[in-house]
Design a protein with these regions (language model features):
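Alpha-helical elements of Rossmann-like donor-binding domains used by nucleotide-donor carbohydrate transfer enzymes
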Residues: 15, 27-34, 72, 76, ...
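Catalytic active-site module of serine/aspartate enzymes centered on a nucleophile-bearing elbow/loop
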Residues: 82-116
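Conserved loop-alpha-helix segment in the C-terminal half of the alpha/beta-hydrolase fold
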Residues: 48, 55-93
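Alpha/beta-hydrolase
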Residues: 1-68
Length: 116
């Protein structure tokens, strides 16, 4: 892009470009190649309740939140995640919230850990 987001600089772009040049895209794309297999392997746990303390953090502009199942999964958190200690949708943030909102994410994580 002509203008980089505030959370990425030219050194970051150079690093990623060098790594993709060195190793290619295969590793990153393998996640998508295995979606069906992952679904099959995880089928025995579909609908399982996660009782451990948990927290959900996402960016409101994250495309994953627009997936058809995302809203229904979030709506079911009270049932599927009874140990949920926070559900945070960060305004204006996208998919890379740990980079885009590092200080805010760190504060949420530290608060979560302090509460354990």
């Amino acid at each position: 892009p002509e203008v980089l987001p505030a959370w990425m600089d030219a050194d970051d772009v150079a690093y990623y470009a060098d790594e993709f040049d060195r190793a290619g895209f295969r590793g990153g794309l393998n996640w998508y190649r295995c979606l069906r297999l992952n679904s099959e392997l995880l089928a025995p746990w579909r609908g399982a309740v996660i009782r451990q303390p948990s927290m959900f953090i996402a960016g409101e502009r994250d495309g994953v939140l627009r997936f058809p199942a995302s809203a229904s999964q979030i709506d079911r958190f009270s049932t599927t995640l009874p140990g949920l200690r926070g559900c945070h949708i960060l305004e204006g943030a996208g998919h890379w919230i740990q980079r885009e909102r590092a200080a805010q994410v760190n504060e949420l994580l530290l608060g979560f850990l302090r509460g354990l």
